[in-house]
From Swiss-Prot:
Family statement drawn from the similarity comment of this UniProt entry: Belongs to the TrhO family.
Protein's recorded name: tRNA uridine(34) hydroxylase
Keywords associated with the record: Oxidoreductase, tRNA processing
Gene of this entry: trhO
Entries under HAMAP family matching the protein: TrhO (MF_00469)
Length: 299
């Protein structure tokens, strides 16, 4: 049976998440859904999967149930299909932030940073500047191991290990951003939106977020100006610019990304180890995910 995968997020002030949690969990369990829903004072972030009739019912529920006071009435969802259920259980969690930056929570009522859509961004990159003539700098807000799977050509990559490091590296590298148009990007939009809001809040000018992230860019314009694939936080590991799963896998032991060529190594034992963590290896660098870094999101 085909499984429908849904992802969505929104920065919006929420005051009743403690009351919502058991009700949302009960509805998801009744529908037979699995996945993760994060609720925080600054908004919602979710990735769920199930049969078509169940996911359609959930979309109708969250958009129209009076419980949510219309806060998600136009919530956009990203949808993909898979041959199996990628999640083991259904979790609804309360968090301080829907994506952890360890800074004061985003106040959505103060407005979001401007966004740029995929086609406009491609045009800017084609011509080498934005419509005002400023050079365009792509800023990767993802973790280093994700960047290693693929990123935009000549993107700034500060090799962060977790998103909470982002404010410090931006402060240390402000000179890289002066006089330029900055486009922050991530997998599906949530990190680059929060990153853009933070940069705007600390006085950095001409900052945009890539609307819908890398995956929306792939959907709209393909892989132009992008090198490699896009890491995703689910069983698929990585998607190519055609949004098809690649041959990359995630190591069961250390969560490193193991490309197809590394899977031919005698140090790769499915379900046990890979060249990055094999006990007999001297320490081959791996594209390693931080355990529990974040739930699957925005794909």
């Amino acid at each position: 049976m085909t499984t429908v995968n849904l992802a969505a997020y929104r920065f919006v002030s929420l005051d009743s998440i403690e009351q919502w949690r058991p009700l949302v969990a009960a509805r998801c369990n009744t529908l037979g859904l699995r996945g993760t829903i994060l609720l925080a004072p600054e908004g919602i972030n979710l990735f769920i999967a199930g049969p078509r009739e169940a996911t359609d019912a959930f979309v109708d529920y969250i958009r129209h149930d009076p419980l949510f006071e219309g806060k998600f009435a136009d919530l956009p969802f990203k949808e993909s299909l898979s041959d199996s259920q990628p999640f083991r259980r259904m979790l609804v969690r309360l968090k301080r932030e829907i994506i952890t930056m360890k800074k004061p929570a985003i106040k959505p009522e103060l407005g979001r940073a401007p966004s740029v859509d995929a086609r406009t961004l491609k045009a800017w990159l084609d011509q080498g500047h934005d419509d005002a003539g400023r050079p365009v700098v792509m800023l990767d807000t993802r973790n280093a191991f994700e960047v290693d799977v693929g990123t935009f050509d000549r993107a700034l990559d500060y090799r962060i290990d977790k998103f909470s490091e982002f404010p410090a590296v931006i402060e240390a590298n402000r000179a890289d951003l002066e006089g330029k148009t900055i486009v922050s990007f991530c997998t599906g939009g949530i990190r680059c939106e929060k990153a853009a809001i933070h940069m705007k809040d600390v006085g950095i000018e001409n900052v945009y977020q890539l609307e819908g992230g890398i995956l929306k860019y792939f959907e709209e314009v393909g892989g132009a100006h992008y090198h490699g694939d896009c890491f995703v936080f689910d069983y698929r590991t990585a998607l190519n610019p055609q949004l098809a799963p690649t041959a990359d896998v995630t190591c069961f032991a250390c969560r490193a990304v193991v490309p197809a060529d590394a899977q031919q190594s005698p140090l790769y034992v499915p379900g046990k180890c890979c060249p990055a963590c094999h006990p007999g290896d001297s320490g081959t660098p791996g594209r390693r995910a931080e355990p529990g870094a974040e739930p699957a999101r925005a794909v």
